[in-house]
């Protein structure tokens, strides 16, 4: 009786109330929805604007959906409105998109569209603004919490009380209560000069910025001081410090700043650290702060043995948390922000590769774990600045990214737990040689401009350095069957690399970029020549081609650097050369880099190292470059 009463109390035609989890588009087409934001079905049909979810927590929606016919009518109305909006957006966006595609450089390769790869594990990207984002993959706890918080309206943070003081306190550096990061800020006149020098000397080699976007924020920084943010301030200080390091002192004197010249002596690297700490970077990652950290890591911290692994590891994990390993176009980010993220990621991949080469463990960034596209030039950059310069900058970062990806595969095999056999090493050597040959022919077919000649020469220099690393372990095994070929191959590559390095450093045409070369000394090529001289059965004279070449390289170094930030490798190289010259009975009077000059330049004192200078294996262990 009770059962009959209960069933009879229901209104005829009334269905049980059920939460609607599928998007409206999938529900209408009766498709299985994966509840993504957007779902895979809407991604596949390129109708992500139609991927609408109804809030299950609001009763007025539930009451409407108790009656099926009204629900269908509501869905039809919503979808018709969305379709109309999509049509208008497509009409407006088609022309601008075609303009972007038509103005892309013909030198840059086309990349596949995001729509063609909709089967990827997309995950979720929360974008707070152009500089702050957070990535979470499916099945991760972060994604589950993100989903509950954003789509089920559960305020999971309401019971978590955080003390602001603990978050604001600097993690990296302690700032005096009487000091502020803004105390280091130069006048705008000086700032403008340093910004100009940065784009002239550094931007092509460390391309992490988009000029038009940067200048918009830069002008706001000076015109609206009340809106200044520590993250962007840290980026400015990183740019100032990089520009001063890359600009010769004699050029700085021509600026005629008068009393403002004192701002050229400010430690902007330290100011960058203060601003980075003030930005609360670890707890609130920001793209501007990440750009600043990448800049300073390349320009300043590459001269340290232990700093790169920890700093690059920090940079890498912050970038992963921000989702830079996923291409922004997959999440509907605008082309400019997506391109900035690609450039930053490209430099992080390169830093990871350099750290791997320095320390000797496999690269942490492995192909297949990221889908960020190759960087390229944007039309607004080409329009506002000399197009040849922009194309060259985009070509360089594009090529270096390709080189990093190819070389990363090689280092993964070379530095793995199981050492590859000699046959595999020879295969890697051939693969890299063919890769570089094709890369130059396809991407830099001509040498008509200074930038094209410079990029061709720089890529050729890199291509001749890589085989040395492959054959280096066999150079100390004189009695092995592999010694003869490895010695010949390494010697050939070292000679070519050093000759190309000398041209890069001595040709006035490339002088504005020479500072970058000395951040990564040619340790391996120089040691290969020194070993060859020691193993020679003939009497060596000062006019020997190998001796002349080594002296030429060292003659460039003091003239090209002129800063306090030197690397341990240069001191080891100088001392190694002096010991070899002494052993061969060669005069060191004409050697450009003497011990006296080293002291003036504040080099690391390699003479105090407890090293047997006849034990080359020990030298390698002390300097991994």
From Swiss-Prot:
Q: Where is the composition biased (Polar residues)?
A: 93-113
Cellular location of this protein? Nucleus; Cytoplasm, Cytoskeleton, Spindle
**GO terms for biological process?**
DNA-templated transcription; positive regulation of pyrimidine-containing compound salvage; regulation of transcription by RNA polymerase II
Query: CDD domains this protein is in?
Result: fungal_TF_MHR, GAL4
Feature: DNA-binding region: 23-51
rRNA-binding found in the keyword field: no
Which keywords does UniProt give here? Cytoplasm, Cytoskeleton, DNA-binding, Metal-binding, Nucleus, Transcription, Transcription regulation, Zinc
Record carries keyword Transcription = yes
> Where along the sequence do coiled-coil regions lie?
none
Q: Name one GO cellular component term.
A: mitotic spindle
Q: Which residue intervals make up region (Disordered)?
A: 93-119
Gene Ontology molecular function: DNA-binding transcription activator activity, RNA polymerase II-specific; RNA polymerase II cis-regulatory region sequence-specific DNA binding; zinc ion binding
The identity of this protein, by name, is: Uncharacterized transcriptional regulatory protein C139.03
